[in-house]
Regions:
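Glycine- and other small-residue-rich loops at beta-strand/loop junctions that grip anionic moieties
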Residues: 96, 154, 188, 236-244, ...
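Short strand-loop junctions, especially beta-strand C-caps/beta-turns
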Residues: 156, 212, 236-238, 409-413, ...
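Non-catalytic terminal extensions of PLP-dependent enzymes
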Residues: 1-149, 167, 174-177, 276, ...
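Conserved PLP-enzyme active-site core in the AAT-like
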Residues: 130-133, 160-331, 338, 418-419, ...
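General small-molecule cofactor/ligand-binding pocket signal
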Residues: 152, 207-209, 436
Length: 525
C-alpha cells in the first residue's frame, strides 16, 4: 500500500552489502598498524614481556588475527553499520522494557577520554583518585534517588544485580541459620523475567503471582504464598506492562512479617525518578540499570551496570570492595563484615559508571524528575492514540494511566485478519522502525510493548503512530504484504529456531568453524 499524502512515514530501504566476516577479509602480509619495537631503555627496565610467563602458557603459533588494512577495515564497519538500525537512526520506541533513550554524545566523549581509558584497576589508589571520586559520588547520588544506604557498582548487568540480590538474601538467611529452610522466592508474572531466573540459578523455588482484574499483583495470593519457607520477594514496579502497584508497601510488609527480604527490581524506574523511592516502600535491596535509566547506551549485551543498593543492615553483605572516603582521600573498602565476595573482576564497568555520573550531574534533581514526567506524558499520549487504532487494545483497562510503557494487544486484529504481532513488527521495519519482540512472557495475547522514554518529540511519536496505522490498514487490505514483510531490510527472515538449539550456537568465529566448518562460514545472508 502506498504511503498516504500527509503521512509522516518515510520511504526507507536499508543498504545491503554482500560483506564478509572480518576474518574472511584477511590477506597475509596486510597490516593496519605497524607496532614499533620497544625502546632500549624500556626493554631494559621491564624485560621482554615473555620471560615471566610460564612456558606452558605461551603460544606456540601466532594468533589467528585478521590481516586487513585500515581503509578496508573502515569500509567493513561502515557497511555493517548501514545494515543496522539503532537509537540514533530511528524512532526506537518499540523496544519496550529497554528504555531506549537518547545517550548524550558528550558523555561518550568524556568516557573515551584518555583520562578514563588509560587508567588500570591495578594502579595504586593514590593515582586514581578521580575515578574513585566518580564512583563514590555516584553511590551518594543513587542513595538519594533510592533512599537506601549504600551502593555497589560491581554488578555488570541487571540480571547480575538480581543474582547478587539473591546471593545477599541467601547469605542473610545463612547468618541466621535459616538458609536451608527458607528456599522460596516470590515474584510476579509481569516482573522482569530475570527476577525469577536469577533466583532460580541461586537454587530458589519460584512462586509466581498473577494479576487481578486491574492488572495489579494479587495481594491475597501473596498472603497465601508466604510461609516459613519464604526467603524473599523480588518484584518490578511499575511492572513490564506499565502499571504501578500503589499497594507495594503492603507487599513488603507481608513479606517482612514472614521473615523474608524484599528486593526491588528498578529496571522500569525511568518514569518514577524523583517521584517515589525504594525507601518509602520499605525495600531492603534495589538496583538500577545505569545503561538504561541513567543515559548510558543499552544494547548488544553490554557494557552495562546494575548498581545495587542496600539498607544499612544489608549493606554488610554487599560485594567487595565498595568505595569509601575518609575526609582526605578515596579508597577501596574491603571492610564489609558479611560480604558475599566479588561478583565480577575489579570494581564495575567504569565507562558506564562515568556516563551515568555525567548524566545525573547534567540534569540535577529537578531534571531527573522532569525526565520522568515527560516519559510518563509521552507514554500516556501513545496510550490514547494507539488504543484508537482499530484492532489494538490495552489490557487491564481498570488502570486508566500507565507509567513508562504499555504492553498492548493485537488480539482483535489477529482474530479479524490473521495478522499477528510478529507480522506487525516485521512490517514496521520496512519504514525504518527497529524490530523488537521483547514481550515475554506471552500472558497478554498478541503482545506488543512500546516505551517512548522522555527523549522523543510529539512529532516523532506521531511518525511511529502513522506507521502502526499504515500497517493495520494493510492488514485489512493487503494482508500478504504484511505477512511477507520485511521487504526493505537486509535480511528478509531469520530462522529463529536456532536460538533455542545450543547445538547451533556459534558466538565466535572459532566456534563457527569448529561446529560448522568453512562451508557454513561462507554463507551470506
Amino acid at each position: 500500500m502506498e504511503i498516504q499524502p500527509g503521512s509522516r512515514l518515510r520511504n526507507f530501504h536499508q543498504a545491503k552489502w554482500d560483506e564478509e566476516v572480518i576474518f574472511e577479509l584477511s590477506t597475509p602480509g596486510q597490516r593496519g598498524l605497524h607496532v614499533p619495537e620497544a625502546e632500549t631503555e624500556i626493554s631494559d627496565l621491564v624485560g621482554d614481556g615473555l620471560s615471566r610467563i610460564p612456558a606452558s602458557m605461551r603460544r606456540t603459533t601466532a594468533p589467528a588475527l585478521p590481516e586487513v588494512g585500515q581503509m578496508r577495515v573502515l569500509k567493513h564497519y561502515l557497511r555493517l553499520s548501514q545494515q543496522n538500525l539503532g537509537g540514533d537512526l530511528n524512532v526506537d520506541i518499540g523496544q519496550g522494557t529497554c528504555t531506549m533513550k537518547y545517550n548524550p554524545k558528550i558523555n561518550e566523549k568524556i568516557a573515551a577520554s584518555s583520562k578514563a581509558q588509560d587508567i588500570h584497576p591495578h594502579q595504586d589508589e593514590s593515582t586514581v583518585q578521580g575515578a574513585l571520586r566518580v564512583m563514590y559520588e555516584l553511590d551518594l547520588f543513587l542513595r538519594e534517588i533510592s533512599g537506601l544506604d549504600r551502593f555497589s557498582l560491581q554488578p555488570s548487568s541487571g540480571s547480575q544485580a538480581i543474582l547478587t540480590m539473591a546471593a545477599i538474601m541467601h547469605e542473610y538467611h545463612e547468618v541466621r541459620g535459616q538458609a536451608d529452610t527458607r528456599d522460596e522466592l516470590i515474584t510476579t508474572i509481569f516482573s522482569h523475567p530475570s527476577d525469577a531466573a536469577a533466583a532460580a540459578v541461586k537454587g530458589y523455588r519460584i512462586i509466581t503471582l498473577y494479576p487481578d482484574e486491574q492488572g495489579m499483583p494479587d495481594v491475597e495470593a501473596l498472603k497465601a504464598a508466604v510461609s516459613e519457607r519464604t526467603a524473599g520477594l523480588f518484584i518490578t514496579n511499575p511492572e513490564d506492562i506499565g502499571i504501578f502497584n500503589p499497594r507495594i508497601a503492603e507487599f513488603t510488609r507481608i513479606v517482612h512479617e514472614a521473615g523474608g527480604i524484599c528486593g526491588y527490581d528498578q529496571a522500569n524506574a525511568n518514569g518514577i525518578l524523583g517521584i517515589t523511592r525504594a525507601r518509602e516502600a520499605d525495600f531492603d535491596l534495589c538496583f538500577f540499570n545505569l545503561h538504561k535509566t541513567f543515559g548510558a547506551p543499552h544494547g548488544c549485551g553490554g557494557p552495562a551496570a546494575g548498581a545495587l543498593g542496600a539498607t544499612r543492615e544489608l549493606a554488610e553483605y554487599l560485594p567487595v570492595p565498595v568505595v569509601g572516603y575518609d575526609g582526605s582521600k578515596y579508597f577501596l573498602d574491603y571492610d564489609v563484615p558479611h560480604t558475599i565476595g566479588k561478583v565480577r573482576g575489579f570494581y564495575g564497568a567504569f565507562p558506564v559508571i562515568l556516563k551515568s555520573y555525567a548524566w545525573i550531574l547534567s540534569l540535577g534533581a529537578e531534571g531527573l524528575k522532569e525526565a520522568a514526567r515527560v516519559a510518563v506524558l509521552n507514554n500516556n499520549y501513545l496510550l490514547k492514540k494507539v488504543t484508537e487504532i482499530p484492532g489494538a487494545t490495552s489490557p487491564y483497562t481498570g488502570s486508566k494511566r500507565r507509567i513508562e510503557q504499555v504492553r498492548y494487544s493485537w488480539e482483535e486484529l489477529y482474530n479479524e485478519t490473521g495478522i499477528d504481532t510478529h507480522d506487525v513488527t516485521r512490517r514496521m521495519a520496512d519504514f525504518g522502525f527497529h524490530l523488537w519482540q521483547s514481550h515475554h512472557p506471552f500472558v497478554v495475547p498478541q503482545p506488543f510493548t512500546i516505551e517512548p522514554t522522555e527523549s522523543y518529540s510529539k512529532e516523532e511519536l506521531d511518525e511511529y503512530l502513522d506507521g502502526l496505522r499504515h500497517v493495520v490498514e494493510e492488514a485489512r487490505t493487503e494482508p500478504e504484504t504484511v505477512k511477507r514483510a520485511p521487504h526493505n531490510s537486509v535480511v528478509h527472515r531469520i530462522d529463529e529456531s536456532s536460538l533455542d538449539d545450543p547445538e547451533k550456537w556459534a558466538v565466535t568465529w572459532r566456534a563457527l568453524l569448529k561446529k560448522h566448518g568453512r562451508t557454513a562460514a561462507k554463507i551470506r545472508s
